[in-house]
Amino acid sequence: MSYKIVTDSSANLTDEQIESYNVDILSLKYYIDGKEYDSYVKGVPTDYSETYSLLRQKAKITTSLVSREICDAVIKPILEKGEDVLVLAFSSGLSGTYQNIENAAKDYREEFPERKIIVVDTLCASLGEGMAVHYAVKLKNEGKTIEETAKWVEENKLKICHLFTIDDLFFLKRGGRLSGSSAMIGTLLGIKPLLHTADDGKLYVTGKVRGRRAAVEHLIKSVGERGTDIQNQEVFIVHGDCEEEAKYIASEIKKRYKVKKTVYNYIDPVIAAHAGPGTLSVFFIGDKR
């Protein structure tokens, strides 16, 4: 039976990936000065330059979850066409988006009893979630059933490593992860926190280094040290409007570890509102997170 893979905008897939994967996107929303924006609009090239400019000015950006209205607009037409749906959702440890989608899916299962609707809590974020989509699409294209594909994601999602560094401690302070005094001292000393997404799908600080260069080097080395059969993987990278550094990481990963392909993209505004400009992250498959 034919099925469609759906994910949300927090997967941070590039426009090219969305097209080549043939996936549908549930857009999260964000708000600046009371004006509503969609993180993703089908057919409209992604451009977050204005949002990042406002973030650098410390503008307050608020965010919201995937709504029932968005679920109805994206998922119901697929079901009405007679296709099943596999949704790979943003980590429940960071957002209520998964639960909102699952609540909608319960109603769809009653309305379309002949259809299969599977919603997976990926416990992933950004292009880590995008990596789960990447492998799911490969399995689908190989002829795997919706159940087989969902099972693979469930069994392997905790092998998708998410490693981050945040450049501006203001955003950790604003999010309550860092005290004001610690943020001030850390900024003066050039401290850069190192973070990862753990098995519970939440973000934790795992260490710190002095200086941006050391933080970038940590990300690069971690790929080589922790990646499984890394030369045969695709490594994904996201950046908070610091594309040249993302390109540098991609180049070094290819040079040092013979990685065949890397993909990099912007962090969407919903995540950037909490992480800030200058954030960098790498995603790859390891034995564990």
Where are these regions (language model features)?
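Mixed-charge interfacial surface used for oligomerization/domain docking
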Residues: 4, 10-24, 29-35, 94-97, ...
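Class I S-adenosyl-L-methionine
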Residues: 36-100, 106-110
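Short acidic, glycine/Ser/Thr-rich loop/turn "cap" segments at secondary-structure junctions
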Residues: 86-89, 117-121
